[in-house]
Amino acid sequence: MADLTGKSALIIVEGYGTEEPELLEPAAYLREHGANVTIAAAQNPIDCVTGDRYDSQQIVPDKTLAEVGAEGYDVLVVPGGTVNMDRLRINPEAHRIMCEFMDARKAVACICHGPWLLVNAGVAKGKTVTSCEFNRIDMENGGFVWVDEEAHVDDSDG
């Protein structure tokens, strides 16, 4: 992994139902490689879960969704958690943030159910994506071209 010193990452979640490893592991990885990481949420504290149903720790976010956008950040990370994403994908602030990142052609990384936000924000059409197999139909119905890969980068315009 390249040195990320001087780079800034924004991680956004709704609050309840965020998968703890999908939030904390990317944050730790980015920090270990030099990135500044901001965690923003719609609610405070963030009530994490594991396995979508087992309560885990609470995390205090750095900012609210209303306080952040694409400006000042190099990458957006969207962790999963079924309940987290079911709420985040209908959140107008999350839509605004996603559209800002896409319009600025900045990197976006979605984990597990994270691509639901791309669909609901209206930025999926014609892009390629991978996801958990159980999300495939949602991704295709949302306008994505789904590919069966462990990780995938869509280099299309915008």
Protein language model features and the residues they cover:
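Active-site-adjacent pocket-lining segments in enzyme domains
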Residues: 2-46, 58-158
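Charged, often glycine-rich, active-site loop that binds/positions anionic groups
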Residues: 51-59
